[in-house]
């Protein structure tokens, strides 16, 4: 008899109970998940799941076990008490059971799009079952949770729990910004950060701001030659409203007449030789505009000036590692 379970309920759509977050909280008491948000990119067949917990140890154990279980998980990045899962859309077999060699005690069995919602399918055993049946389902951002059986609603001990958690569908929007300042005044990262803080559009969730070190050897630059990127999770139908807000905020607050703003939508990071060139070469506006067009990146600024060079660099590096903030070759 095997000691792990591979998609035990695969294809079984039976639902015994559906609970909203407040009902989960009432049943189990308040627990520890502080955020649960899912973005999807149907063109690439990918999803990104952001989860924040009050306790770092829970995040770290979940990450190791979800990776071991496989399923829809492709990779997971950890930042303190939060994780970001890169996942594939669909339902997949998992190596799930009591934690052991190549077996995870918690598993992401699938991610599916249902209209303007996203369903994530989970399995957990023992304490990890409490995570998928009681903790995640009451997180801010969750709409409701389906439990296939009454047994799934009594997690803990040595028992297995499975759930399907529904959240609003979001898309990822990355915005690169450069050349808002001059040698006399201004700071692009400050203006970009203020823009993010001021955005209160319903259906838009601010994720993070990144600083991108550009080539400090270019002759026509501000002192440190640094661009900024803003990342947002955005509900379908809200993207243009967000972009209009960002453009108006940035251009009204800029002290430079050369401000550039570039936009990329989706979860697949563009691969381009300009990832290196933006840190090592002196580039022209024309070649950066041509590369942006090739990659499906669009400019929304009105200046159409040299800021577009750094804005392209910022959006290309917006979702990469700490190397974004360094000179070429620094790690």
Please provide the spans of the model-predicted regions.
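Conserved mixed alpha/beta catalytic, RNA-binding, or beta-rich assembly cores of soluble enzyme
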Residues: 2-331
């Amino acid at each position: 008899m095997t000691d792990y379970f591979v998609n035990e309920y695969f294809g079984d759509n039976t639902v015994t109970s559906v609970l909203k977050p407040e009902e989960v909280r009432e049943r189990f008491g308040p627990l520890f998940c502080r955020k649960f948000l899912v973005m999807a990119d149907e063109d690439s067949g990918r999803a990104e799941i952001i989860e924040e917990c009050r306790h770092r140890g829970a995040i770290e154990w979940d990450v190791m076990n979800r990776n071991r279980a496989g399923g829809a998980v492709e990779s997971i990045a950890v930042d303190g008490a939060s994780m970001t899962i890169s996942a594939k859309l669909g339902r997949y077999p998992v190596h799930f059971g009591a934690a052991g060699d190549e077996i995870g005690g918690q598993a992401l069995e699938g991610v599916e799009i249902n209209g303007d919602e996203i369903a994530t399918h989970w399995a957990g055993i023992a304490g990890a079952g409490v995570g998928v049946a009681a903790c995640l389902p009451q997180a801010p951002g969750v709409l409701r949770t389906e439990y296939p059986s009454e047994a799934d609603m009594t997690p803990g001990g040595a028992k297995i729990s499975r759930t399907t958690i529904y959240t609003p569908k979001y898309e990822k929007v990355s915005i690169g910004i450069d050349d808002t300042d001059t040698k006399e005044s201004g700071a692009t990262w400050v203006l970009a950060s203020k823009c993010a803080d001021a955005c209160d559009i319903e259906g838009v969730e601010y994720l993070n701001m990144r600083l991108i070190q550009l080539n400090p050897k270019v002759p026509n630059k501000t002192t440190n030659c640094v661009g900024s990127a803003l990342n947002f999770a955005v509900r379908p139908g809200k993207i243009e409203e967000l972009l209009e807000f960002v453009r108006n905020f940035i251009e009204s607050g800029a002290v430079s007449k050369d401000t550039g703003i570039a936009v990329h939508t989706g979860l697949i990071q563009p691969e381009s030789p300009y990832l290196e060139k933006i840190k090592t070469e002196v580039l022209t506006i024309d070649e950066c505009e041509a590369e942006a067009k090739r990659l499906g990146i669009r400019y929304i600024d009105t200046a159409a000036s040299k800021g577009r060079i750094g804005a392209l660099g910022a959006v290309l590096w917006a979702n990469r590692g700490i190397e974004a903030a360094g000179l070429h070759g620094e790690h």
